[in-house]
Amino acid sequence: MRVIFMGTPLFAVPSLRAVAEADNDVEIVLVVTGKDKPRRSQRAEPEPTPVKKAAKELGLAVLEIDDVKDARFADTIARYRPDVIVVAAFRILPPAVYELARLGSFNLHASLLPRYRGAAPVNWTIINGDRETGVTTFFLGRKVDTGNIILQQRTPVAPEETAGELTERLADIGAGVVLKTLKRIRDGEAEPTIQDDAMATRAPKLTSETTRIDWAEPVDAICDFVRGLSPKPSAWTVFNHRKVKIYRVAPGMFQLPEQDEQQKVPGALVVDGTRMFVMALDGWVEILSLQMEGKRKMGAADFCCGFRCEEECPSFS
């Protein structure tokens, strides 16, 4: 079975390796990925995508592409005569490309579709406090993330798991599901299930506006929000007119002295020795790891050692 694999980030690498190293009649005839990224230093070589790095290590042919809608791209894919196209964290393919696969093209998605259709399923899973998630393989169709489901595998979300940690785990789970999906397609045993649109939820692309912390939310919601955005793109707030990225937090056990009760407003910041707490709607959030604009990432203790504030009642906003 001739397979073309398409993917770019680290999430796709376990699936690529699993298919390439599988002991069956599957052959990866081409790997398609994004273009190399320029580095900060003009003298340095451009940075290849994680998928390109892995493909080169595996001795596979690689095609870098910018525009998947370019007719020349479809012509190139056609020359490789794919039986199946496997997609993992890549672009939105036009029908002119995915319909070239003799047995079909399928995508690996990091959620239990139809829940969390969109660009950021792992982030929104944690932000919304879900305690279970999984991966889905589905045949590509004309609308994004709506194709018929081939296989799914569920997994619990750990209470303190970050988006980065969950993404890595789902990538490994997904690799096994991709192999099972290929086997079913090869053996003619794929029995696709139509998605129930009434059960669909969205996982839109994250923006600067949607990643800002609202300290008027409950403690648990803020903790989920920060976990769901860590390490990238990261939740953020403002302190002393400067942007602060927040990477790790926890529900805080702290009691203000009676004379300081007026500080109990959302966003109020209290530094207690080497620990720092921020007031939320229903309690305190302890900040464990953060990064001031223009500074390195640091633990709360390092921040507290150099703590300076121009305000009488410091706060995050």
From Swiss-Prot:
Entry EC number(s): 2.1.2.9
Annotated positions binding (6S)-5,6,7,8-tetrahydrofolate: S111, L112, L113, P114
Catalytic reactions of this protein: L-methionyl-tRNA(fMet) + (6R)-10-formyltetrahydrofolate = N-formyl-L-methionyl-tRNA(fMet) + (6S)-5,6,7,8-tetrahydrofolate + H(+)
Keyword terms of this UniProt record: Protein biosynthesis, Transferase
Highest taxon listed in the record's lineage: Bacteria
A Pfam short name: Formyl_trans_C
Leading EC class: transferase
GO molecular function, one term: methionyl-tRNA formyltransferase activity
Cross-referenced InterPro entries: Fmt, Formyl_trans_C, Formyl_transf_N, Formyl_transf_N_sf, Formyl_transferase-like_C_sf, Met-tRNA-FMT_C, Met-tRNA-FMT_N
Annotated GO CC locations: cytosol
Function: Attaches a formyl group to the free amino group of methionyl-tRNA(fMet). The formyl group appears to play a dual role in the initiator identity of N-formylmethionyl-tRNA by promoting its recognition by IF2 and preventing the misappropriation of this tRNA by the elongation apparatus.
Entries under NCBIfam families matching the protein: fmt (TIGR00460)
Family indicated by similarity: Belongs to the Fmt family.
HAMAP family given in the database record: Formyl_trans
PANTHER family linked to this entry: METHIONYL-TRNA FORMYLTRANSFERASE (PTHR11138), METHIONYL-TRNA FORMYLTRANSFERASE, MITOCHONDRIAL (PTHR11138:SF5)
Identification of the protein by name: Methionyl-tRNA formyltransferase
Organism: Chlorobium phaeobacteroides (strain BS1)
